[in-house]
Each structure stands twice: as structure tokens, then as C-alpha cells.
């Protein structure tokens, strides 16, 4: 295992964060992002999920149709778990995004799973998924895979096996 690498990122959105690559394995790695300055807070269903001091710990797993992120507040308390449903995560090399020699990428398939702390997980953005199919951004087959992946994530989160 290599020591964690750090990179501080800044966007045109008035947002800064620091990413540490915690652990690197052949088929996955775990990142830990801590938010710095922000022009506005990010929320899901009126629950703040990103503000200065909040951390997103993300598991990127090659070949999976999802990326799971645990969200912690500035005290380290669990706020919730957010999951992007996506094309199969694939390994890429020489990425500057995470400050590591290797990384993973995916294509977002519009559907997400959200689990607030101590509650059951549920789907987000089903309407966006259907719009994406209707507009030709993704295929009906990809949408079906997305729904299957979301069901799998809900099962995983429901069993707390992440």
C-alpha cells in the first residue's frame, strides 16, 4: 500500500476540497474528501451533505455499476450514504483528479440512491433516468441495468454491508 496522496482542488463553483487516497487495491480504492470553502451548502431533501469540514469517504470499485459515498459531518458523525448509479467503473491511468497515478471513472446514469443516517435507503432521480432514456442520453438497456444496480445498492445498504 502506498501512503495517502493529497490534492487540494478548486472549482469555478467557489468550492475547495482536499482529497486523500486512503487505500489502493488492484480492483478498487477509497478516497476521503474534506470540504473547504463553499459559496453555498449542498443538500438532499433539506439535509446538508456538503459544507466546510464535511467529509465524503468514497469506495471506487472496478466493474461495479455504482460508487458508494459515506458522508460525515464536521464532528465525524454519519450524515448519510449517497450512491451514484453508473456505467461500470473502469480503471484509468494518470489522473490528476485524485492526485494519484491511477484512478477510476464512470458515466453517470442519472439514478442515485440516498440513505439518510439511521433510515432506510431509497431512490433519487427516477424521473431524470426516464428523461435521459427519452432524450437518447442512455439506452433502455442501460436504464434497466441502472435499476438493477440501484436495487443491489439498496440491498447492500439495508444490510449495512459496505
Regions found by a protein language model. Give the residues of each.
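Charge-rich, low-complexity N-terminal segments
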Residues: 1-52
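Hydrophobic residues embedded in beta-strands of well-ordered beta-sheets
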Residues: 29, 78-79, 121
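Generic secondary-structure microfeatures
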Residues: 35, 85-89, 117
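A hydrophobic, small-residue-rich beta->alpha segment in the mid-to-C-terminal subdomain
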Residues: 109-152
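Structured beta-strand/loop patches that form or line metal/cofactor-binding pockets in enzymes
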Residues: 49, 57-108
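Short beta-strand-initiation
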Residues: 16-17, 108-110
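Short acidic-glycine loop/turn motifs at beta-strand connectors
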Residues: 25, 74-75, 116-120
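Cysteine/selenocysteine-centered motifs that mediate thiol-based redox chemistry or coordinate metal-sulfur cofactors
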Residues: 148-162
Amino acid at each position: 500500500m502506498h501512503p495517502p496522496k493529497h490534492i487540494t482542488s478548486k472549482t469555478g463553483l467557489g468550492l475547495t476540497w482536499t482529497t486523500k487516497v486512503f487505500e489502493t487495491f488492484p480492483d478498487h480504492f477509497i478516497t476521503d474528501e474534506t470540504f473547504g470553502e463553499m459559496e453555498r451548502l449542498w443538500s438532499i431533501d433539506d439535509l446538508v451533505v456538503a459544507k466546510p469540514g464535511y467529509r465524503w469517504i468514497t469506495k471506487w470499485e472496478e466493474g461495479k455499476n455504482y460508487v458508494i459515498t459515506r458522508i460525515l459531518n464536521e464532528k465525524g458523525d454519519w450524515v448519510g450514504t449517497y450512491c451514484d448509479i453508473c456505467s461500470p467503473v473502469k480503471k484509468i491511468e494518470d489522473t490528476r483528479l485524485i492526485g494519484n497515478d491511477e484512478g477510476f471513472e464512470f458515466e453517470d446514469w442519472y439514478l442515485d440512491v440516498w440513505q439518510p443516517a439511521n433510515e432506510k435507503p431509497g431512490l433519487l432521480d427516477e424521473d431524470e433516468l426516464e428523461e435521459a432514456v427519452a432524450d437518447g442520453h442512455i439506452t433502455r438497456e442501460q436504464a434497466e441495468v441502472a435499476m438493477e444496480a440501484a436495487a443491489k445498492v439498496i440491498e447492500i445498504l439495508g444490510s449495512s454491508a459496505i
